Amino acid sequence: MNEFLINLEDKPGAMAECCEVIGEAGINILAGAGIASDSAAVVIVTDDADGTVEALKSIGVTYTMRPLETAVLHHSPGSLGVFTRSLAENGINLQSIFIMKTDGDEVHIGYSTA
């Protein structure tokens, strides 16, 4: 599984264009987050990395594709803190993290590291 860090213009419709072209290619977006300050960016996870590459190329946006690791944590207070602390103690720098789904007592996460 991969994540895509997409650099966008900070203007109305920039994210919509990316989501539309990915959807029109029949690709499902599984998770995502966006943020804007001086510039705008969105990070998404899809069910088809190759198709996502082609879709993003077709609209000329700048992106970076990174491998996404996954883990299943207990869905309780503090479990994410324990997980991220273990990464830090092993010298692993966290680049991104997603809540992929919750299922009863479990939370499935996706994350990338440097």
Regions found by a protein language model. Name each.
Residues M1-A114:
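A conserved regulatory-domain signal marking ACT and ACT-like small-molecule sensing domains
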